[in-house]
Amino acid sequence: MILKQKGTIDFDSDNLSDKKFDQYIEYYIGHVQAPTSAQREWLYDTSHPFESLSWSVVHNGVLTNYENIRAQYIDWDVNPVDTAVIPNLLQHFTEQCRDECPAHEIIKQTLELLEGTFALCMVDTDCNDVYLARQGSILHYNDKGDFSTLGGEGFKLLPEGVILMLKDNKEWVEVNKFNTKSPFLFL
């Protein structure tokens, strides 16, 4: 279930705390601002999460080559926001693999094409698996299955170039690595 709206989501007034949704909601993923690149005003199609048939993505950062990716792989995508290329590129490689590639390999293939900065949460909506990755941007996770760009007590910084997967809705495990093209050097 995806709920996307301008302003605050109130779990009570939006009836999300109603027990009838418990069977459908395994976790909540949120993004609290409109995109900062091409579209500053909140619109449904240009706000997080961005979706394709099999993927849902929230992203913090700035992709510098999204127009080139769009032209080469997904020229039908006309969304002006850089983030929109990520789920569509994941979908492109998912369809190319025809169920022969594990999701973490599709993610690796996608991330190695991206230039710029990103902190990503990706959901494979075909099986509800959740993945994290980052390049340049900050992303923290903890041993309870949570993640945040803000961090806090008990949170660890996700290393660049690592893909984590949420196992059993309670812990993050490393499932792959990718070659980064980070514009920043952290020592």
What are these regions (language model features)?
Residues 1-187:
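N-terminal segments that mediate ammonia production and transfer
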